[in-house]
Amino acid sequence: MKEILITNDDSFESEGLKKLIKMLKKEFKAKITIVAPATEKSACSHSITLTKPLRFIKVGKRFYKLDDGTPADCVYLALHALYKTRLPDLVISGINKGANVGEDITYSGTCAGAMEAVLQGIPAIALSQFYKKSEKELDFKNALKITKKIVQNIFDKGFPLGKKEFLNINFPAKSNIKGIKICKAGKRVYNFEAHSNINPRGVEYYWLAAANLDFEDEKDSDIALLKKGYVTITPIMLDLSAYDKMKKVKKWLKANNE
C-alpha cells in the first residue's frame, strides 16, 4: 500500500485541502496522513520554527494540525515524528487558493512544503488553483481530476525528477481546460504596496499588499499559459547556483584584486 503525506499553507480548514483529501481517499488505496498549519501561512516561504516548541493537535484519524507551524515545519516534523518504520511515497502540498507562479514560488508556503519534502528525499508536488476576482467560489473539479491522473502516473511509472526537484502545478480558473503544458516559471514584475494606518494609541502600522499580478510578456511562461486556460507543470530544482556566471565572477574578482 502506498503512503501519502499531505500539507498546505492555507490551514487545516481550507476547502482545497479537504477536497484533495476526499478525492485521494476515494480514488487510491493508500495510507494518507495530513499535517497542516493551524492557521493560514500564505507567503511564509520555506521558514521553519526554531524559537519555540511545536505540537501536533489531532483533528481526525491520521489528521493533525501543527500549532503555529509552517508548511515546512509540518513536513519536517511529520517525517521525523510520525513515520517510524517507513517514509511516505509522495508528499502533496495544496490545493492552494491562488496561483503560485514565477518568482512567487520563492514566497509560497505551498511550494515550501514540497521543497522540504524533496530536501528530505521524498518525491513531492505542489498544487495551486488560480482564480479570478469575479469568482465567488473556487471550483476544484478540474484540479482534482488532473491531480488524480498525475498521482496515478507517479505510482505507476515513478517520479519523473531527480533528487531535490519537485513539480509545481497550477490549475487555471473555472473554465474549459485547453490542455496541459510543461513550461518554465515566468518573471514577475513586483509592485508591492505598504498601506499606512494609525492605531487607537496613535502608533503607525502597515499592511503589505501586492498591487497587481504583473508579469513580463513571455508566451511560454507558466503565468501566460495559465491565463490562457492551460494547466501548467513546471519542474523546479533547488540548486540555485548560476553555473553560467561562475567564470564571469571569477574574472571580476581577479580584476578587482590586480
Spans of features found by a protein language model:
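A cross-family phosphate/adenosyl-ligand binding-site feature
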Residues: 4, 20-81, 86-87
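Glycine/threonine-rich flexible loop motifs
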Residues: 99-108
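Hydrophobic/aromatic ligand-binding patch that stacks against planar heteroaromatic rings
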Residues: 113-118
